[in-house]
Amino acid sequence: MLFRTIYNVIIEISFPILWIIGLFSKKINLFTRGRSKTFKILKSKSLDSNKWVWFHVASLGEFEQAKPLIIAYKKHFPKDKILLTFFSPSGYEIKKNFSYADCICYLPWDTIKNVNRFLDFCNVKLAIFVKYEFWPNFFKGLHKRKIPVYSVSSIFRPQQLFFRWYGVGYRKLLYGVKHYFVQNDLSKKLLNNLGINAVSVNGDTRIDRVYQMVKQENKLEIMDDFTSGIKCFVAGSTWPEDHNLIE
């Protein structure tokens, strides 16, 4: 109860602050102004008239994890409508025209009012959140409406707030997920230790996406000029542990 009270106070006061910061930051401006159009987009798509499957991702990297699932789902259930939401402008601005989704918009700020309005607009039959996305008011709203929530390509570490003694309020969110599809055995073990057993280890769906991209034609003139026929290895979004392997 205390966690939710503190969380909701922070959520309510933080968005007006972000609007002010947005006057001086292009990215934050996209973040706030983009959200001001969310309900207009939802209304134009008549999301209350069909049963929708909702995928939510934070940014571009998480989108790449969700993309193989969205495409596969659409191929198997072509009559179902796909709603895709983004948290960050770096994902939305690049992928807002993704053809396999029937409606694409920003995730509204996680206030109780926004959550209720969003779920009133959207006739969602199931929700799929990718990797690190756990939003207290959205999870509570989905639970109250008996809409199942799945967590895909999620990954957990002992250092995360969920597993700290002072993170008990945030930890409760984990019990609102119907099934976890996690990236590794450690994530499964951490969830199992909390009594959460609806967990499958499926790896990182981004591997599937990278494999698909490798099979495509990816020639770029600028890269051909840069490499001059010499083999070139490109790494991006790497972690320190990756650097040892690369070197």
Predicted feature locations:
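A residue-level signal for conserved active-site and pocket-lining positions in enzyme catalytic cores
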Residues: 13, 55, 246
